[in-house]
């Protein structure tokens, strides 16, 4: 009987653990999740953006408590074929090709294509260093994608924020 119960226990343990995915767990504080595509091209030839998405963190410069602002924007064509910007809060405004050209200028100025394929995030860092990401699709079929921890000293998040703030301000 003891052998039978041991066998049943072993089978049940195997069945339950078969569905367990250790990679789905949240990484421990200081743990690094690295899904970097080291073969991703570091040069994007196209300049014609067809879709754009970004998410980043910035320190609120007006707050005495060093509050963190989370910025999230998506740019794509809407159902009518016009370019639409959607902010993280769901607010949407129409834009034009000039906005896409401005975004591409920031990508070029800060050489963000060099980050293409980077997908590496360290868990448990202070909020200011939380993940930032960018995904850009081009008419040529090329794609720029990266995700990594924020770096407060970098200028591209502020440049992107300013472009989007101006776009929303013009449409109000």
Task: Please describe what each predicted stretch is.
Residues 78-91:
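Acidic/histidine-rich, surface-exposed loop or edge segments in extracytoplasmic proteins
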